[in-house]
UniProtKB/Swiss-Prot annotation:
The WWE domain mediates non-covalent poly(ADP-ribose)-binding. It comes from Danio rerio (Zebrafish). It catalyses: S-ubiquitinyl-[E2 ubiquitin-conjugating enzyme]-L-cysteine + [acceptor protein]-L-lysine = [E2 ubiquitin-conjugating enzyme]-L-cysteine + N(6)-ubiquitinyl-[acceptor protein]-L-lysine. A zinc finger (RING-type) spans 42-80. Residues 281-295, 308-322 have a biased composition (Acidic residues). This is E3 ubiquitin-protein ligase rnf146. E3 ubiquitin-protein ligase that specifically binds poly-ADP-ribosylated proteins and mediates their ubiquitination and subsequent degradation. May regulate many important biological processes, such as cell survival and DNA damage response. Acts as an activator of the Wnt signaling pathway by mediating the ubiquitination of poly-ADP-ribosylated proteins. Neuroprotective protein. Protects against cell death induced by DNA damaging agents and rescues cells from G1 arrest. Promotes cell survival after gamma-irradiation. Facilitates DNA repair. Its main location: cytoplasm.
Length: 364
């Protein structure tokens, strides 16, 4: 297990060669047994780093280990400092030459010059060196399947059908193959061979159009632990604009403001043929109002001159109303036969001089 000093190695200590595995090494005194720089250990998988990357907090991990940990939390596994959102697309590799060497067959390939690939979107990805060695060893021993731990997920490689899938999810399968090293490929273990030139320090950021494409690629690769991008693009959903419903015109006061329809015109014509007009009801309403006004009994208990004049006016009104319709005459006779509003019995002889029967005559 790595000690505390080995876990917190920085780039300066690696490049200068002053501290390796807790031992001081003088500068310029290269060891004949280890001509290259030692590979740091990953605090997550506790193994030698495969394609080591350096976070902004200067902690070093495997690229796939950082990718697997970022699905649970966008923070460093040691100091809990936030990791940039675009770090997986523009990682800071400690040795970019190692990535190119593994892609060209310099390391991670067997003596036969073959490498292992898994299917991606519009191309093939090469497995990392550690996984390639495990697959080559199982294939040389004639095994039918092999298990691989990639970014915290356990995968099963079916060497007979040449497919891989997660052990707890058999439905999602991806093709794999064993081929020569120098075939066209997209990259190694999710790391592209042609990285974005804007990823270098101090470069001008790319325009918004490039950022949208990068976000789409990141969403595609989130569906797999090994950096494949065969999943359906998980772009941000765009809301559909729904226009507001148009309210119907409000009828103020219950009267239609639109022109009369054909049904209204037909109704008016039918009423005209029957000699019925809405204006014919106005005299009847006026007579009813006059009757209500004259229905109040005199407080003095006897007829006055004003009462006699009222009777004369009512008689004249009755003569004028004789020219109205027969139905109105019957209605008028029914009003004349009503008892007086006083409630007392009225004599028929007393009502003979009063056309409406509402004005009583007191005998002395």
């Amino acid at each position: 297990m790595a000690s505390c000093g080995e876990v917190n190695l920085t780039v300066d200590s690696l490049t200068s060669g002053k501290k390796v595995s807790g031992e001081a090494v003088p500068e310029g005194s290269g060891s004949p047994s280890s001509p290259s720089l030692p590979v740091p250990e990953c605090p997550i998988c506790l193994q030698s780093c495969v394609h080591p990357v350096r976070l902004p907090c200067r902690h070093i991990f495997c690229f796939l280990c950082v990718k697997g940990a970022s699905w649970h939390s966008k923070r460093c596994a040691l100091c809990r400092r936030e990791v940039p959102e675009d770090f997986l697309e523009r990682p800071t590799l400690l040795s970019p030459e190692e990535l190119k060497a593994s892609a060209t067959g310099g390391c991670g390939t067997g003596s036969s010059g073959h490498a292992w690939y898994y299917e991606g979107r519009n191309g093939w990805w090469q497995y990392d060196e550690r996984t390639s060695r495990e697959l080559e060893d199982a294939f040389s021993k004639g095994k039918k399947s092999a298990e691989m731990l990639i970014a915290g997920f356990l995968y099963v490689a079916d060497l007979e059908n040449m497919v891989q899938y997660r052990r707890n999810e058999h439905g999602r399968r991806r093709r794999m193959k064993r081929d020569v090293v120098d075939i066209p490929k997209k990259g190694v273990a999710g790391l592209r061979l042609d990285p974005d030139p804007n990823s270098s320090a101090g470069a001008v950021p790319a325009p918004a159009v490039v950022d949208v494409s990068v976000d789409g690629a990141a969403a595609e690769r989130e569906s797999s632990a090994d950096g494949a991008d065969t999943g359906v693009s998980g772009g941000r959903p765009q809301g559909t604009f729904v226009p507001a419903p148009i309210r119907p015109p409000t009828i103020l006061g219950g009267h239609l403001t639109s022109p009369a329809s054909s049904s209204d015109i037909q109704l008016v014509q039918t009423l005209a043929q029957l000699n019925i007009s809405p204006n014919e009801q106005e005299p009847e309403e006026e007579d009813a109002e006059d009757e209500d006004d004259s229905a109040a009994p005199d407080a003095s208990g006897y007829d006055s001159e004003s009462g006699t004049s009222d009777d004369d006016e009512q008689v004249e009104d009755e003569d004028e109303n004789e020219h109205t319709d027969g139905s109105q005459g019957k209605h008028r006779l029914q009003q004349l036969n009503r008892p007086p509003p006083g409630g007392g019995p009225a004599n028929s002889g007393d009502r003979s001089g009063c056309p409406d029967g509402q004005c009583t005559v007191t005998k002395v």
